[in-house]
A protein has these predicted regions:
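Short alpha-helical transmembrane segments in multi-pass integral membrane proteins
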Residues: 1-19, 77-142, 186-241, 297-364, ...
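Hydrophobic transmembrane alpha-helices of multi-pass small-molecule transporters
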Residues: 61-64, 176-180, 206-210, 281-284, ...
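Short runs within selected transmembrane alpha-helices of multi-pass transporters and secretion channels
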Residues: 70, 139-157, 165-173, 194-207, ...
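Small-residue hotspots at the loop-to-helix junctions and early N-terminal turns
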Residues: 46-57, 132, 136, 195, ...
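Small-residue-rich hydrophobic transmembrane alpha-helices
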Residues: 49-109, 146-165, 271-329, 333-335, ...
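N-terminal transmembrane alpha-helices
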Residues: 6-43, 60-72, 76, 101-108, ...
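Helix-terminus/linker motif at the lipid-water interface of multi-pass membrane proteins
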Residues: 31-49, 119-126, 182-189, 248-277, ...
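Transmembrane helical elements of multi-pass membrane transporters/channels
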Residues: 17-36, 138, 172, 201-205, ...
Length: 445
């Protein structure tokens, strides 16, 4: 594996080359979740779209646990790999896979038991509750596939092989959309058809990804290594838990804020659901830069090159600025067309106004989450997790407080006004921590 470009090539080039396959892969992943919503909205009903939307923020939390856990484990793997300790690399990878698979089974069982209760507590409109429960139960049954897929992808990224999960994701995405159309349009399975299509597609990706991972290790000629090492769990958990918090902050905020949106009825929920699907796609470049900066920082600190870490952070901010400008140019003129792709020609006025209003406002503020993600990636890669975690909790608190306190008084618009305020606050706290230079000393310890 000749993947030392993260510690040798120019920072801008290294980050872009590393992040690009992740961006493309995540775009495909978000595209097929968007396709789920669009197919349900067009071929079933607006209420079916609202049901999937009612489940979305909750399912996103589990996705974030999987992604955050994978990122946390990948920092440890990246350090071993950057230091050329390949046996420890292999052991750390398998330990992460075993630990997070066990966690996914436990969470899946809990989800199946409490899915209806959770949706009721989130104030889900009664006319879409049963549909949302059906969708969630199938989702929870497939949770191990979701966790395995995301952790495997993170392991490939840590090894500098970010193109491998991309290939499987492209296949899985195309297969998922085809199954969506077959099960929803032809077999009339409604929201359950969408859930089954996702489960099957992710299962295939997991099997293929694991086979290739084993093959990649054989190419390294590592020899025998332990498949599970308990001593690796604590350092992984120390980084994984704050990473999960960081990844979940947005989704937990979305879930609590959605409970406010739910109170405005299923039509507003349908429009909001369409908008946040698009928002998730817009955030993909920044999440990918976050992952790239994290691995870049970990590998360069492992190679004892602090100067390159700072150079990489500056390069990441330039990438964030470029993507932010691109998003403004794409979203602002076309938000009505984008929302109508989900709602169809017979979408209600309330749904259209809600979706368009959200996107039109948010398009100007994606730079805030981008700059936040860049500095968060550096802090996490260096293992500086304390203030990192505090910043993300502040983000969550502000978003939820502003939405829940002011939306019932001033209207639904307060829901989206709360979002950039939280992002900006998070960035300020994380950036000030970066400027102190504590991350250098923490890594050395």
């Amino acid at each position: 594996m000749n993947n030392d470009y993260l510690v040798k090539k120019k920072p801008m080039y290294a980050l872009f080359v590393f992040a690009l396959p992740i961006i493309i892969g995540n775009i495909f992943q978000q595209t097929y979740t968007m396709a789920d919503s669009a197919i349900v909205g067009r071929f079933v009903s607006e209420k079916a779209l609202a049901a999937v939307g009612a489940s979305y923020s909750l399912t996103n939390i589990f996705i974030c646990v999987a992604i955050g856990g994978g990122i946390g484990a990948s920092v440890i793997v990246s350090r071993y790999f950057g230091a050329k300790e390949y046996k420890k690399t292999k052991t750390a990878v398998y330990t992460a896979l075993i630990a997070f698979t066990a966690l996914s089974v436990l969470l899946g069982i809990i989800g199946l038991v409490f899915s209806r209760l959770i949706l009721i507590l989130l104030n889900t409109p009664s006319d879409v509750l049963d549909l949302a429960v059906d969708y969630l139960n199938i989702y929870f049954a497939g949770l191990p596939f979701l966790f395995m897929y995301n952790v495997l992808s993170a392991m490939f990224n840590a090894l500098g092989k970010s193109k491998i999960p991309l290939y499987f994701l492209i296949f899985s995405s195309v297969f998922n959309v085809a199954l969506d159309l077959l099960l929803v349009k032809n077999f009339r399975m409604g929201v359950t058809g969408v859930a089954w299509a996702t489960l099957i597609a992710q299962g295939i990706s997991v099997v293929l990804s694991f086979i290739v991972l084993v093959w990649e290790f054989k190419k390294l000629n590592i020899g025998r290594a332990k498949f599970f090492e308990k001593s690796e769990l604590l350092p992984m958990a120390k980084i994984a838990f704050p990473s999960i918090i960081q990844q979940s902050t947005v989704s937990i905020g979305m879930m609590l804020v959605q409970s406010v949106v739910n109170g405005f009825g299923s039509e507003a929920l349908a429009g909001y659901s369409a908008a946040i699907r698009v928002e998730s796609l817009c955030i993909v470049p920044f999440n990918s830069i976050n992952n790239a900066v994290s691995s870049y920082t970990a590998q360069n600190l492992g190679a004892k090159n602090e100067k390159r870490v700072v150079e990489g952070y500056h390069a990441a901010n330039i990438l964030v600025a470029a993507f932010s400008i691109l998003l403004i140019l794409l979203i602002e003129p076309f938000n009505g067309l984008i929302v109508s792709m989900f709602l169809g020609d017979d979408g209600t006025i309330t749904a259209m106004n809600t979706g368009c209003g959200y996107l039109s406002f948010m398009g100007w503020f994606f730079c805030f989450i981008g700059f936040k993600m860049a500095v968060d990636g550096l802090l996490r890669g260096a293992g500086d997790m304390k203030m990192f975690t505090v910043a993300n909790f502040v983000n969550l608190f502000i978003r939820v407080f502003v939405a829940m306190a002011f939306a019932p008084i001033f209207g639904l618009q307060m829901v989206w006004i709360a979002v950039p305020i939280g992002w900006f606050s998070n960035w300020v706290i994380s950036f000030l921590e970066y400027r102190t230079g504590k991350w250098k000393r923490i890594y050395k310890r």
